[in-house]
C-alpha cells in the first residue's frame, strides 16, 4: 500500500463498522379538529348534498301501522297527519254481518310529494282488532305480519342477485290507539304492547281526546305511563337507544308528554278569519293544530319532522337485526330459498335502510 494514501476498506468490512440505521419514529397524526384550510379543501361536507340529491331522485319508504278498536278515528287521524286521503274509512255496516271474524291486515300505498321529495307511504290497517267478544291472542296476526316483512327483507338481503335497493315493506312505526276511558288500560292494551313492543316501534296515542276535560286528560296520561312502566313496556323512543346527552334530553321531554292525546279531522272551519282543521261541537270548534285543544301537532312533529329517519334506523338496526340474528340461530343457517348465499351473511350497515326502486 502506498505511503500517504488512506487505507481503503472493502464493502464487507464497512458494513461491519457502520451500524444499521434505526427506524424513524412514527410521525404523530394531526389532531382532530385541525383547520382544513391549512391543508386545502377536502370536500367531505358535500356528503349532505349527495344524500339530498339521492333522496330527491329516488324518494324514500315509510310504512306506518295503525292498531285499535273500530270507532277511534284511526283513518281520520292518519289522513290528518299526511293531509291526504291515505287511509280509507270503513263504510257503514251491519255490525253482525260486516265486522271481521278475525283481525285482517290491509296495506294501502301512496306517493306523497312535497318540496321535490317523494315519500312512498304505506298505511297498514288492522280492522277487526279488539272488536270481538273474545279478543284472546288477537295480536298474533299483527305480529305475524310484521315478522313476515322482516323475513321478506332477509331473503332479499342474502340473495346473490340482490337488488341495489331492496324494496322495504318493514313496519317502521305502529300507532296504537287507546280508548279515552279516563280510567286505565284494558288487559288487551297491555297484552298487545307487551308483545309487539319487542318487534316494532310502538307509539301510543289517546284517541278522541276532545271527549275528556283537561284535568281528566292529564290524569289519564299519567296513569297510562305508570301502567306501562309497571308492566315493563317500553314505547318509542326507547331510553336504551338514546345515543348521547342531547338525544336523552330531547327524548325525555317527548316521553314525559306521551301518550299524545289527539283529535283528527279532515274538515276546515273559519276561526278568527283563518281556515283551520277542526271538529265542530256544541261548545265550539276543536282546532286540531291548536296545542291548547289537543296534542296532534306534537304527534305530527314527532313522527314526521324530527324522528322519521330515526324510526327507520331503529327498525333496521334494532328490530330487524334482532329478528335476523334469532332467525339464523334458530335454524342454524340461512333461510331456505333459491339463489341464496351459502356463506356468512353480510353485516347489517349502520346506515338508513335502503329504499324501494
From Swiss-Prot:
<dbReference type="GO" id="GO:0005525">
    <property type="term" value="F:GTP binding"/>
</dbReference>
<dbReference type="GO" id="GO:0032153">
    <property type="term" value="C:cell division site"/>
</dbReference>
<feature type="binding site">
    <location>
        <position position="264"/>
    </location>
    <ligand>
        <name>GTP</name>
    </ligand>
</feature>
<feature type="region of interest" description="Disordered">
    <location>
        <begin position="1"/>
        <end position="29"/>
    </location>
</feature>
<dbReference type="GO" id="GO:0003924">
    <property type="term" value="F:GTPase activity"/>
</dbReference>
<feature type="region of interest" description="G4 motif">
    <location>
        <begin position="207"/>
        <end position="210"/>
    </location>
</feature>
<keyword id="KW-0963">Cytoplasm</keyword>
<dbReference type="GO" id="GO:0015630">
    <property type="term" value="C:microtubule cytoskeleton"/>
</dbReference>
<feature type="region of interest" description="G3 motif">
    <location>
        <begin position="125"/>
        <end position="128"/>
    </location>
</feature>
<dbReference type="InterPro" id="IPR027417">
    <property type="entry name" value="P-loop_NTPase"/>
</dbReference>
<feature type="binding site">
    <location>
        <position position="279"/>
    </location>
    <ligand>
        <name>GTP</name>
    </ligand>
</feature>
<keyword id="KW-0342">GTP-binding</keyword>
<keyword id="KW-0597">Phosphoprotein</keyword>
<feature type="modified residue" description="Phosphoserine">
    <location>
        <position position="91"/>
    </location>
</feature>
<comment type="similarity">
    <text>Belongs to the TRAFAC class TrmE-Era-EngA-EngB-Septin-like GTPase superfamily. Septin GTPase family.</text>
</comment>
<dbReference type="InterPro" id="IPR008114">
    <property type="entry name" value="Septin3"/>
</dbReference>
<dbReference type="Pfam" id="PF00735">
    <property type="entry name" value="Septin"/>
</dbReference>
<dbReference type="GO" id="GO:0061640">
    <property type="term" value="P:cytoskeleton-dependent cytokinesis"/>
</dbReference>
<dbReference type="GO" id="GO:0031105">
    <property type="term" value="C:septin complex"/>
</dbReference>
<dbReference type="GO" id="GO:0005940">
    <property type="term" value="C:septin ring"/>
</dbReference>
<keyword id="KW-0132">Cell division</keyword>
<dbReference type="GO" id="GO:0098793">
    <property type="term" value="C:presynapse"/>
</dbReference>
<dbReference type="GO" id="GO:0008104">
    <property type="term" value="P:protein localization"/>
</dbReference>
<protein>
    <recommendedName>
        <fullName>Neuronal-specific septin-3</fullName>
    </recommendedName>
</protein>
<comment type="subunit">
    <text>Septins polymerize into heterooligomeric protein complexes that form filaments, and can associate with cellular membranes, actin filaments and microtubules. GTPase activity is required for filament formation.</text>
</comment>
<dbReference type="InterPro" id="IPR016491">
    <property type="entry name" value="Septin"/>
</dbReference>
<feature type="domain" description="Septin-type G">
    <location>
        <begin position="58"/>
        <end position="330"/>
    </location>
</feature>
<feature type="region of interest" description="G1 motif">
    <location>
        <begin position="68"/>
        <end position="75"/>
    </location>
</feature>
<feature type="binding site">
    <location>
        <position position="102"/>
    </location>
    <ligand>
        <name>GTP</name>
    </ligand>
</feature>
<feature type="compositionally biased region" description="Basic and acidic residues">
    <location>
        <begin position="1"/>
        <end position="10"/>
    </location>
</feature>
<feature type="binding site">
    <location>
        <begin position="68"/>
        <end position="75"/>
    </location>
    <ligand>
        <name>GTP</name>
    </ligand>
</feature>
<keyword id="KW-0547">Nucleotide-binding</keyword>
<dbReference type="InterPro" id="IPR030379">
    <property type="entry name" value="G_SEPTIN_dom"/>
</dbReference>
<keyword id="KW-0206">Cytoskeleton</keyword>
<keyword id="KW-0131">Cell cycle</keyword>
<comment type="function">
    <text>Filament-forming cytoskeletal GTPase. May play a role in cytokinesis (Potential).</text>
</comment>
<feature type="binding site">
    <location>
        <begin position="208"/>
        <end position="216"/>
    </location>
    <ligand>
        <name>GTP</name>
    </ligand>
</feature>
<keyword id="KW-0770">Synapse</keyword>
<dbReference type="GO" id="GO:0060090">
    <property type="term" value="F:molecular adaptor activity"/>
</dbReference>
Amino acid at each position: 500500500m502506498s505511503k500517504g494514501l488512506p487505507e481503503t476498506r472493502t464493502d464487507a468490512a464497512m458494513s461491519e463498522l457502520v451500524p444499521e440505521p434505526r427506524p424513524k419514529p412514527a410521525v404523530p397524526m394531526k389532531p382532530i379538529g385541525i383547520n382544513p384550510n391549512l391543508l386545502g379543501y377536502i370536500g367531505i361536507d358535500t356528503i349532505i348534498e349527495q344524500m339530498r340529491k339521492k333522496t330527491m331522485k329516488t324518494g324514500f319508504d315509510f310504512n306506518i301501522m295503525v292498531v285499535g278498536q273500530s270507532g277511534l278515528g284511526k283513518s281520520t287521524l292518519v289522513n290528518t297527519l299526511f293531509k291526504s286521503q291515505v287511509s280509507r274509512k270503513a263504510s257503514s255496516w251491519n255490525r253482525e254481518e260486516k265486522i271481521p271474524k278475525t283481525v285482517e291486515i290491509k296495506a294501502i300505498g301512496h306517493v306523497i310529494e312535497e318540496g321535490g321529495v317523494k315519500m312512498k307511504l304505506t298505511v297498514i290497517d288492522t280492522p277487526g282488532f279488539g272488536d270481538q267478544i273474545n279478543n284472546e291472542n288477537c295480536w298474533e296476526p299483527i305480529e305475524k305480519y310484521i315478522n313476515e316483512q322482516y323475513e321478506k327483507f332477509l331473503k332479499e338481503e342474502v340473495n346473490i342477485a340482490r337488488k341495489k335497493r331492496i324494496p322495504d315493506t318493514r313496519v317502521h312505526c305502529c300507532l296504537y290507539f287507546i280508548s279515552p276511558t279516563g280510567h286505565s288500560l284494558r288487559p288487551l292494551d297491555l297484552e298487545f304492547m307487551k308483545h309487539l313492543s319487542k318487534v316494532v316501534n310502538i307509539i301510543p296515542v289517546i284517541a278522541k281526546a276532545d271527549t275528556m276535560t283537561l284535568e281528566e286528560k292529564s290524569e289519564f296520561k299519567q296513569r297510562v305511563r305508570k301502567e306501562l312502566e309497571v308492566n315493563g313496556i317500553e314505547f318509542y323512543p326507547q331510553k336504551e337507544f338514546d345515543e348521547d346527552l342531547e338525544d336523552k334530553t330531547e327524548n325525555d321531554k317527548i316521553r314525559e308528554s306521551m301518550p299524545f292525546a289527539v283529535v283528527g279531522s279532515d274538515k276546515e272551519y273559519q276561526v278568527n278569519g283563518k281556515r283551520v282543521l277542526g271538529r265542530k261541537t256544541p261548545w265550539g270548534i276543536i282546532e286540531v293544530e291548536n296545542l291548547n285543544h289537543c296534542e296532534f301537532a306534537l304527534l305530527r312533529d314527532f313522527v314526521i319532522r324530527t324522528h322519521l329517519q330515526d324510526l327507520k334506523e331503529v327498525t333496521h338496526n334494532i328490530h330487524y337485526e334482532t329478528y335476523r340474528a334469532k332467525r339464523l340461530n334458530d335454524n342454524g343457517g340461512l333461510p331456505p330459498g333459491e339463489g341464496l348465499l351459502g356463506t356468512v351473511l353480510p353485516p347489517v350497515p349502520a346506515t338508513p335502510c335502503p329504499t324501494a326502486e
